[in-house]
Amino acid sequence: MRPSCASSSSSSASPSLRLSSVTVAVDKATSELLRTPDWTIIIAICDSLNSNRWQCKDAIKAVKRRLQHKSSRVQLLTLTLLEAMLKNCGDFVHSHIAEKHLLEDMVKLVRKKGDFEVRNKLLILLDTWNEAFSGVACKHPHYNWAYQELKRCGVKFPQRSKEAPLMLEPPPPVTQSSSSSSMNLMSIGSFRRLDETMATEIESLSLSSLESMRNVMDLVNDMVQAVNPSDKSALKDELIVDLVEQCRSNQKKLIQMLTTTADEDVLARGLELNDSLQVVLARHDAIASGVSLPLLLQAPEPRETSSSLKTCGAAALESADSESSSSSSSSESETDEVEDVKDDFIQLAKRHALLNALHSDEEEETLLLGNDNEKTAEAEAKTQCKDLALFDTTTTTTTKSEQDIIELLSLTLSTTALPSPQTQPQTQHPSFFADDNILMNSYVVPWAQSQEEPQVPKMTQFAPSGPQFQPWPLQQQQPYSYGYPQPQWSGGQVNSNDTTFWSQGGNENMVFERNLQVSNSFPARATGTSGAATAATVDRQP
């Protein structure tokens, strides 16, 4: 009959915790890593038992198993959970506790004389339950039996505090019509008592557990500092894992305490402890994830006094202000230097612009004196220069200071001294001895070397595609003296006008004014077929 009722109740109500999750919830609520009770899980367990009574059996089994744990911390957390279940659940929980021999296990723990806190907690609970369930119409005599058994053994129960809430007595029988309203009132009363219990726990935490939290944090910090940052496996040690989990749970409880406390001293210490916990946990997480440790994740120094903290904070603020002022002054000095440099560039540019304006008239006059050929040559040269120095349109935009430097350099190059033009225009003619027409590279005697070409008039072409030649004026030719003595048989100067050469491709005679080499004077031989060859005659005296 019981399983059928359980199945019907489970089908009608939606359970907040499944059958398998009740045991897991009990294990979490009594974890060895917890320093104080986790009331969120405890409330969830009580709600699940009130909505699904068939889960009470599994919950009591899990509590009995956790009560046999070797750790005194686990035993204390288990007793706290058991007390909350008796206060916030109905008669079905009281019956299961009495039937599952849980009270006998509690008596055995008292007789063992183990941990003092655990033994004291057991005696207080048994004394409270005996007072709550005693009377003429006692439904659960097991609680009275446990109390009397310890009394016969000579155990002295501690004096209970008058402010401690008494055990919730079983509700009187009510009719079915008013069952829903009475259940609501009972749940409201139970939650009020639960809130009072949580408030007392949080208040005791705020006054007594800050130092223990700091000790655990310092221990974790020392272990994390001793670990090699490149070795992740060192953080998998069981002791380090337990301490880190304890720090995380302490941080959660600390945040809850800070939201409810009104003491300024406790609030200041709690905030400081919270910051230190965040730094230590962040350092641990950085090493565990293999991320490089930031400079800010340094070990928190131990707290000395509130006055030392205030002085350190004031010194930090002063150093931050000095750094900010120095950085602002350095930035202002840099901007002033940049502005001074820009002003110098602007002044230089204006100076060069004035110089260009002064010399612009002279340059225009000299440029207007050039002939058409010079203009054509200059145009070709400019086009060649433009072809060589192509403008890169993909050049990135420079800053304002770089543009000023470029403009200054361009002004400096534009103001360089130009070569003075000739007073008379000179016509460019291709020469017979031009570099483009020389076909061989031979030695040239000194008297045949190229001299400074004077202005020559335009001469006729002796071939359709050949270069043009014209005799040079005699009045502009200056004789060249080589310092050689005249021969004995030479009676006078060599007549340069009698020296004549016959051109190869034309019928015109081309006369060159030069000093002849006397020792190698031979008559020229005719090479053409169109006319008779004329020998070059030289006046010499024997």
From Swiss-Prot:
Residues 314-332, 524-542 have a biased composition (Low complexity). It comes from the Eukaryota. GO terms for molecular function: phosphatidylinositol binding; ubiquitin binding. It is found in: Membrane. It is a peripheral membrane protein. InterPro entries: ENTH_VHS, GAT_dom, GAT_sf, TOL_plant, VHS_dom. The keyword Coiled coil does not apply. The modification Phosphoserine is found at residues 161, 521. Keywords: Membrane, Phosphoprotein, Protein transport, Transport. GO terms for cellular component: cytoplasm; membrane. Preferentially expressed in flowers. Its main location: membrane. Residues 201-289 form the GAT domain. PROSITE patterns: GAT, VHS. Residues 303-340, 522-542 are annotated as: Disordered. Signal peptide: none annotated. Residues 29-158 form the VHS domain. GO terms for biological process: protein transport to vacuole involved in ubiquitin-dependent protein catabolic process via the multivesicular body sorting pathway. Might contribute to the loading of the ESCRT machinery. PANTHER family: TOM1-LIKE PROTEIN (PTHR45898), TOM1-LIKE PROTEIN 7 (PTHR45898:SF13). Belongs to the TOM1 family. This is TOM1-like protein 7.
